[in-house]
Amino acid sequence: MDENKIIDQLFSKEYTPQDDSEQAKNGDVSLYGLLDEVANGRRLMNCLFHSPMQMGNKLSTDKLDGKCRQIQRDWIDEEKTITMNSGALQLDGPVLFSWSHNVAPTSHQETINTTFKQGSPSRGSNKPKITTTSQLFDRASAEIDKCIKPNSKSWMVEERFERNEAHTADGKKPSTWANSDFKVDPLQKFVVKELPKEKKKSDGDKTKKNKSKRKSFFGFWGHSGSKSGSKKKSEKPIEAKNEIQDEVSQKSGLSPDDDTTFSDKNTIQSKQESMSDQQAEPKVHEPAVTNTGCSEHDDGDGFEQVPAQSSYHPSSEPSIASTPSLTLDSFIPLQPKKKI
């Protein structure tokens, strides 16, 4: 409605009523009719567009703006917390892997440095960067040097001098990580490997060391010497026995095997004879000798009368071997005297 028409209606004498625009005409559909088709449509409409600060016919969008601002504040707070926390606590943030340029070989690193220097404009003097720890250490060492005598040299002064020399080199000296052998792919599983064990010394080295050892001055007093002497002594009689057995076998015309068997039989027989003689011979007391007064001619008759008990009967036949055989049991090796 125009403002002029409203004023004319108020000041005119005759009022002519007009058709109300709010009344629905045939075939027309209002906005509320559309909202009623949906469940809770009017409530949703009021929540989105209603506000107490409504000016004129302008629709309010404060709720939408407020929601957008709230989401923006949440995002800003999340970014602040991520940047403030350390790398170990950045669980929600993305993780990026990249190879360090220090791991590259020296030739590749030098080419990168030259291209960077040529392309970038000179920004004052190229001073080496000093870390905060080195700066704090230099300050503390300077204060300590004041307390120490100037003539005395401390380890801190030497270390600071070495650090200054390294900085003056201006990157000519390669870093410790430039030629390192430690390379790990971060995208693969890290496998722990054992360090190589020390090799055990071989037996040849031990024998060489034993040979190189000098014998002590009192080595003849040791136990090892007595053992070696006894072994040497025991070997000599065995060789002598073998020589004697060979000679006997050559004389008798028998083989060494037959000779040994024959000698063993003889030794067994000789032992049996000695045992039987000791058991069979009784102890006989000799009678006292008396002069019967007989003539010298009667002495012959006395020899003829021999008692029956004194008759000698050999228990076994005599052995055929001309010389007694020697057995190994008859030789006993000499043993050294024990120390007192």
From Swiss-Prot:
GO terms for cellular component: clathrin-coated vesicle. Residues 193-340 are annotated as: Disordered. Residues 193-207, 235-244 have a biased composition (Basic and acidic residues). Residues 217-228 have a biased composition (Low complexity). This is Uncharacterized protein YML037C. Residues 263-279, 307-328 have a biased composition (Polar residues). It comes from the Eukaryota. Present with 815 molecules/cell in log phase SD medium.
